[in-house]
Amino acid sequence: MSSRLFVFFLICYATADKIEKELISDGFQLFTWKWDDVHHVYVITVWLLIASLAKILFNLMKPISKWCPDSSLLIIVGLALGWILHQTSLSGATLDSHTFFLYLLPPIIFDAGYFMPNRALFENFDSVLVFSVFGTIWNTFAIGGSLLLMAQYDLFTMSFTTFEILVFSALISAVDPVAVIAVFEEIHVNEFLFINVFGEALFNDGVTVVLYQMFKSFALIGSENLSVLDYATGGLSFFVVALGGAAVGIIFAIAASLTTKYTYDVRILAPVFIFVLPYMAYLTAEMVSLSSIIAIAICGMLMKQYIKGNVTQAAANSVKYFTKMLAQSSETVIFMFLGLSTISSQHHFDLYFICATLFFCLIYRAIGIVVQCYILNRFRAKKFEMVDQFIMSYGGLRGAIAYGLVVSIPASITAKPMFITATIAVIYFTVFLQGITIRPLVNFLKIKKKEERDPTMVESVYNKYLDYMMSGVEDIAGQKGHYTFIENFERFNAKVIKPVLMRHQKRESFDASSIVRAYEKITLEDAIKLAKVKNNIQNKRLERIKSKGRVAPILPDKISNQKTMTPKDLQLKRFMESGENIDSLYTLFSDLLDRKLHEMNRPSVQITDVDGQDDIQDDYMAEVGSRSNLSAMFRSTEQLPSETPFHSGRRQSTGDLNATRRADFNV
């Protein structure tokens, strides 16, 4: 033991002596260069800064940003930087799969799940499931089989096996949610079309990764070493991986809701759990070989409605901003690195393979969409029209998911350079050509766009009434449809789930707070209309009496009122005689009633913005509507003179005022 201590002190003495000699020989230095200590983080920060500045510049260049999506412009910036680095003989950077799947992809998928309009997704769950599962399987085998058939005639410069080309066809079938959101948010398509394309793109990625991992395992094992049991296990893994990822997401969503429920005394920790637990869901699913994309997407979708009741409004807004910031930063870096990697990566250019891949991607997606929509239209009340099917076929944009998967192909697959080149070519074609031309096509085909107004209070109420009425009709008919499922879930949610996962929630058999609030507003509106009708009848009676030359009898209470009426009373009387002012008062009292009922139903402190306008909405469809309303507001501001609601010379109806108000409750 003593000998070991002696050796340890001897090593420490030698090390200290060496450091002392270096300090003495070099002397004291005012500045020391420590680039090796910070260069990794510094390079990442510089790339993020360049990408963010480029995005600001694009928004300032209105003629260009109007027609070109930000994703295509960021790819151009990456191409330019890659060319500069190549010409100056500097080492370029590439987007490796480890960085992409562990650091850049999780914020994007969490953002997509957290801001997913859950009601619209559930109403179209059947079509989203068909497109994302069966559509992906169809594209994978159709593209792979066609390319394999062409390879039998030696049309390509590199050879590949059956499972190797299925690996490529699986990754090239991945519709990228980043590219879809970037394009479809800007063209303001209707909710029905948006949720089907966006929902397919989100869950299609999870299915794609499952197929990719399965075929990659088959390729590494070798077709000659596979048995029937291996094929059966691989097919079973498709369902196990997908459903297991969903189960992981549900577990961590419950954990996030429960932890935020008990952070009332330490509110600063609530956002920590909101971001850490979904990321842990992603890592946990990845660790046990389940679908990490489905896990974090499901976690974000389920936890949203519960954590909002456990945190303050200020914290909820902070979560929205930070989620958007992370997702936007990741998207920006990914698209720029796609352009940069084009110059840095090793390529094998095969024109026939690229053209064949692009052709099969377009034609088989169109065939799959048409066939699936034909089958779905036979069982759906809301049909897919031909123009909807065309936009869905044309909107299958490829992006970072496909590139992240292709660069993670094992080096043992000899055709990997050809696959990388073909993937980049398909991404460029879809992002540039299809992304730029989809807006003119939407305008040319007159696709129904998102309405530039929020639903009125009456529309929201009667939509809710319709849900309960249809649930009753299904119950009477003895059929269990999705309206019955909605009612049962809402009752179970209000009675069991919310009291467990949310603070200040009592066990109720029915959650009717939104209907009560809306009914109070309808009652107020009816009272205002009744007062206006009585006022008009009295005015017409007085005019008829005056026209006949008779003097209307003055009652004693009116005489006393006229004698004691002050100038302020006369001003108020003239103000109330105007129907326009009655409308404005209704709007004022309606908003006050909403605020008071909201405070009664939500005892927690709510902090609102100064201007009352959220620039980040609760889901993507609200985001699209907000942008439309904002542009409409600016157009109306430029056309109308500045007038107050009480003194403008233009008549405003109650319906117009209601149309500009925000909806009171979520249908």
Swiss-Prot record:
Stretches the record annotates as Disordered: 637-667
Coiled-coil annotated spans: none
Entry's localization field: Cell membrane
Membrane topology classification: Multi-pass membrane protein
Keyword Iron in annotation: no
GO cellular component, one term: plasma membrane
Name of a matching Pfam family: Na_H_Exchanger
GO terms, biological process: potassium ion transmembrane transport; regulation of intracellular pH; sodium ion import across plasma membrane; sodium ion transport
Tissue-wise expression: In early stage larva, expressed in the twin excretory cell processes. At later larval stages, expression is more restricted, resulting in a 'beads on a chain' appearance.
Positions annotated as glycosylated: 310
InterPro entries: Cation/H_exchanger_CPA1, Cation/H_exchanger_TM, NaH_exchanger
Keyword line: Antiport, Cell membrane, Glycoprotein, Ion transport, Membrane, Phosphoprotein, Sodium, Sodium transport, Transmembrane, Transmembrane helix, Transport
Keyword Lipoprotein: no
Post-translational modification remark: Phosphorylated.
MF (Gene Ontology): potassium:proton antiporter activity; sodium:proton antiporter activity
Modified residues (Phosphothreonine): 644
Transmembrane regions listed in the UniProt entry: 41-61, 73-93, 97-117, 128-148, 165-185, 192-212, 236-256, 268-288, 325-345, 351-371, 390-410, 418-438
Recorded family membership: Belongs to the monovalent cation:proton antiporter 1 (CPA1) transporter (TC 2.A.36) family.
Job of this protein: Serves some physiological function other than regulation of cellular pH.
Name under which the protein is recorded: Probable Na(+)/H(+) antiporter nhx-9
Name of the coding gene: nhx-9
